[in-house]
Swiss-Prot record:
GO terms for cellular component: plasma membrane. It comes from the Bacteria. This is Uncharacterized protein y4bH. The chain crosses the membrane at residues 10-30, 46-66. Its main location: membrane. It is found in: Cell membrane. Keywords: Cell membrane, Membrane, Plasmid, Transmembrane, Transmembrane helix. Residues 68-91 are annotated as: Disordered. It is a multi-pass membrane protein.
């Protein structure tokens, strides 16, 4: 189970990198084109900032989805437990 969750974090981080690049571009008041993203390689401090924001965003999305799945699972087992107890009761 841990192996799959680690694979998911990589999948969620990749779109986060793009979101981070767009957020930094929007905050700076510039429009972001693919050429601007490639130009970040020449500015390593900006590249590190974009990677950090993207990774952080991806991790937060993954944790939120995991929390939602856990809550839905707990509600499902609680409902099944209540319903099964009602079915067993003689009427």
């Amino acid at each position: 189970m841990h192996y799959r969750s680690q694979r998911r974090s990589v999948l969620f981080t990749a779109p986060g990198l793009i979101v981070g690049a767009l957020a930094i571009g929007a905050a700076g008041g510039i429009s972001v084109s693919p050429g601007d993203i490639l130009a970040l390689v020449e500015k390593p401090h900006l590249l590190v900032a974009v990677l950090f924001v993207g990774a952080f965003t991806g991790i937060m999305v993954e944790q939120a989805l995991s929390r939602m799945r856990r809550q839905d699972g707990a509600r499902g087992t609680a409902r099944a437990g209540r319903n099964s107890a009602r079915r067993r009761m003689p009427s």
